[in-house]
Amino acid sequence: MLQTSNYSLVLSLQFLLLSYDLFVNSFSELLRMAPVIQLVLFIIQDIAILFNIIIIFLMFFNTFVFQAGLVNLLFHKFKGTIILTAVYFALSISLHVWVMNLRWKNSNCFVWTDGLQTLFVFQRLAAVLYCYFYKRTAVRLGDPRFYQDSLWLRMEFMQVRR
């Protein structure tokens, strides 16, 4: 079971990684004149998203629901977050690769192709949804019902079996 002190530490780490993601999304365009710094920020951002994915799955694995073999129940409850996180991760990597390819050799030019603008908008939209759903999932996983046998779990199990 995830103890309160450990949960607070894990939640703080998740929020720190989300804050870094928000920071890079907000201010990375200001550093387009320094492509090496922008590249490092993008790499760290992608690693932070990957760490958040790992942390959320470790939290899933730590639940009584998962240990009882009800993986389908967890997936059903949190599939939106799982899918959105994967989509956001793919969009972020795509945007970072595209931006670095266009601006690496000539960082003085302000290059925005139609495709890049479209990808930029979708990545930023996905970022907002990712932050909301990820925070909601992280907080919901603090519910004690996920860490012990309960009437709620038995009722959910019966609904899944139908």
UniProtKB/Swiss-Prot annotation:
A Pfam family reported for this protein in Swiss-Prot or TrEMBL: TMEM138
Name a single GO cellular component.
vacuolar membrane
Its keywords, alphabetically, are: Cell projection, Cilium, Cilium biogenesis/degradation, Glycoprotein, Membrane, Transmembrane, Transmembrane helix, Vacuole
Q: Which residues cross the membrane?
A: 7-27, 41-61, 80-100, 115-134
Entry function: Required for ciliogenesis.
Q: PANTHER family under this entry?
A: TRANSMEMBRANE PROTEIN 138
Q: Which family does it belong to?
A: Belongs to the TMEM138 family.
Q: What is this protein called?
A: Transmembrane protein 138
